[in-house]
């Protein structure tokens, strides 16, 4: 006996969802604190940022070396032959020590600028840690929200599946029209599609979390923490004030401004003289002619000074450029403060909006559950229509999803407010972050692209073929429906005219 279209579609979509929702065994339990700690200890992007500290420290050593002793050696050899004279051959070797006595303040300014650079690099790394912490929190809550969304969508699928069975039974008994069966089948199909999309979103969010934690990209995870409402009692003005005074990127911009001030001093040093001290021994020896074979040893010390009194305006141009860079840094600092003010306010307003939604959406869920129950019972009693049942179920799903959204919006925006304020890491998080420096830097392997010889199964894309088979089954169902379209149209017309069986 040929099964009804709705029943066949239900079985097909159920098989699809069963394949997609299968979860691997032995998933690792991960709390939010664990996720943050692992990310701080292993995130590659954070490691890249931390390398800037080593660069800044090397630049500081270089600047200090420019203002200290240096030594150089020299050697020469020459031969000379003039007409009617014997050939003359001689050589010399020398060692010279140099020390900059006065550079017009250039070397000292470069040292101070490099010291600011070390501070900037440290603040940049610290800010990157705080941002990474927020990114992990967001990814964690995104995954949790997706997981609860799956639960709601699965409940909808279960309801529409049961509803389809009920409608088919009523249709077989002659108390409902066939158009109700078709409508119930379509709603079940739509619910299945929504479920599949939410399951995919969950996997994408887990992949994002694994990437931030820098763990095995295929490792199954079980997120053990969940939303718990916790009040945020700090007023907006205090949040903005804290951000202005404590944001690491704003502090880094302040140091950058100081660097540009030192750059002006470096440029202005071009108008001043330089004084250098040099001293060292030298040895010279004459080899030919043999009658003049002699050696000379000297020790010299002296002070030299130089002063560029005219350079066609080159120094003036360098000073003007340095001052323009300083003014730009001042504007960048002002803009960073304004951006921080806006970002804190935006996150704060969004957090409060989500907080207000928590209570209202909770009430809406209870009301929607009652409405859905009434609609189902009225339909079973023959006093309601299918549209009322569908609308009530949709309203219930929407209310539940809105409540879930409000919960995790509040959690995410609260974390964003804390991040935008520039609140530092906890002691435990700093301990985890300290492990980052000890990781070795591995050389990325070079891969050669070759055509596969054996065509082994791809674990990452193995479901693609399965989905293709499922799509083929759906296409077959649609084709079958198209073949029976004239019969279905006739049946629907009869039912609308009151002649349905």
Region locations from a protein language model:
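Acidic, low-complexity, intrinsically disordered peripheral segments
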Residues: 2-4, 26, 402-501
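Amphipathic alpha-helical coiled-coil segments
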Residues: 48-63, 128, 132-152, 162, ...
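Small/polar (Gly/Ser/Thr/Ala-rich) solvent-exposed segments
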Residues: 47, 70-88, 98-129, 251, ...
């Amino acid at each position: 006996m040929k099964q009804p279209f709705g029943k066949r579609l239900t079985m097909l979509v159920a098989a699809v969802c069963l394949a997609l929702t299968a979860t691997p065994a032995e998933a690792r339990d991960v709390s939010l604190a664990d996720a943050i700690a692992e990310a701080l200890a292993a995130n590659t992007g954070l490691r890249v940022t931390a390398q800037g500290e080593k660069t800044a420290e090397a630049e500081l050593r270089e600047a200090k070396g420019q203002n200290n002793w240096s030594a150089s050696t020299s050697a020469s050899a020459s031969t000379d032959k003039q007409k009617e004279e014997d050939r003359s051959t001689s050589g010399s070797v020398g060692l010279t020590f140099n020390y900059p006595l006065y550079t017009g303040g250039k070397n000292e300014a470069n040292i101070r600028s490099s010291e600011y650079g070390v501070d900037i690099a440290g603040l940049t790394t610290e800010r990157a840690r705080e941002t990474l912490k927020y990114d992990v929190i967001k990814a964690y809550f995104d995954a949790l929200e997706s997981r609860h969304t799956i639960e709601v969508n699965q409940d909808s699928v279960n309801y529409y599946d049961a509803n389809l069975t009920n409608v088919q039974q009523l249709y077989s008994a002659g108390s409902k029209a066939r158009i109700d069966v078709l409508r119930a089948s379509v709603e079940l199909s739509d619910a299945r599609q929504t479920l599949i999309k939410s399951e995919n979103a969950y996997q994408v969010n887990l992949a994002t979390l694994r990437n931030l934690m820098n763990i095995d990209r295929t490792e199954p995870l079980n997120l053990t923490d969940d939303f718990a409402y916790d009040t945020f009692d700090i007023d907006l003005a205090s949040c903005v004030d804290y951000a202005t005074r404590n944001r690491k990127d704003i502090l880094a911009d302040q140091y950058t401004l100081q660097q540009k001030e030192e750059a002006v001093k470096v440029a202005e040093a071009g108008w001043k003289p330089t004084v250098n001290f040099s001293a060292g021994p030298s040895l010279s020896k004459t080899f030919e002619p043999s009658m003049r074979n002699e050696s000379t040893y000297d020790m010299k010390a002296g002070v030299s000074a130089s002063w560029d009194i005219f350079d066609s305006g080159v120094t003036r141009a360098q000073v003007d450029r340095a001052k323009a860079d300083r003014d730009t840094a001042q504007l960048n600092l002002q803009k960073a403060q304004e951006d921080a003010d806006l970002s804190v306010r935006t996150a704060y307003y969004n957090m409060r909006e989500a907080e207000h939604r928590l209570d209202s959406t909770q009430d809406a869920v209870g009301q929607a559950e009652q409405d859905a129950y009434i609609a189902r019972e009225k339909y079973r009693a023959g006093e309601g229509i299918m549209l009322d049942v569908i609308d009530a179920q949709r309203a219930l799903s929407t209310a539940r999803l809105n409540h879930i959204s409000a919960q995790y919006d509040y959690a995410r925006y609260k974390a964003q407010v804390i991040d935008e304020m520039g609140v530092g890491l906890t002691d435990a998080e700093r301990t985890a972050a300290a492990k980052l420096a000890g990781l070795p830097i591995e050389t990325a392997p070079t891969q050669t692209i070759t055509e596969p010889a054996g065509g082994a199964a791809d674990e990452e894309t193995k479901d693609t073929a399965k989905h293709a088979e499922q799509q083929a089954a759906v296409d077959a169902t649609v084709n079958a429906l198209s073949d029976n379209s004239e019969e279905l149209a006739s049946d629907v017309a009869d039912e609308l005219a009151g002649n349905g069986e």
